[in-house]
């Protein structure tokens, strides 16, 4: 297994890893930003399940849905912006199984665009205004992530990766 071999080559003992954060590929998950009415936390969870089924193309019975409140909507009073994320139980369970088979204890599991964004926000040179853009170029696909200080957030998975560029060279 590639992960076990990588850990071995780096002389890393999986049992000594205190915090594990991983990402599920954007093509295996869906991310959507929506605007909804401000409501108590108890109501928000069931509302987000309904909203996810409405906005995210996925069979709701097999979906694992999570959300994060991004903040108050700047254009509409009494509304909030929410980031919705969904993937299938099968994708999530396969991801967890892969980590466990490698001797790793699953911790934070995010979707790649959000994991990259969270990592980037720890940088000191994060712009206070304007937009920040991240382009994660993978072998077969890429992720474009755009966000700004006013809770603007956009992500798109692109079916173009570095492998395609090498084929054309």
Predicted regions, residues:
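Active-site neighborhood for divalent-cation/phosphate handling
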Residues: 2, 19, 23-124
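Phosphate/pyrophosphate-binding loops at sites that engage ATP/ADP/AMP, CoA/4′-phosphopantetheine
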Residues: 5-18
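Solvent-exposed loop and beta-edge segments used for protein-protein assembly and interaction
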Residues: 14-16, 76, 136
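Gly/Thr-rich phosphate-binding beta-strand-loop-beta motif of the actin/hexokinase/Hsp70
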Residues: 18-23, 123-154, 158, 164
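Loop/helix-junction capping segments adjacent to catalytic residues or to phosphate/diphosphate-binding pockets
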Residues: 93, 162-163
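Residue-level detector of flexible, active-site-proximal loop/helix-junction positions
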Residues: 113-115, 159-162
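Conserved small/polar residues in nucleotide/adenosyl-binding loops
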Residues: 167-169
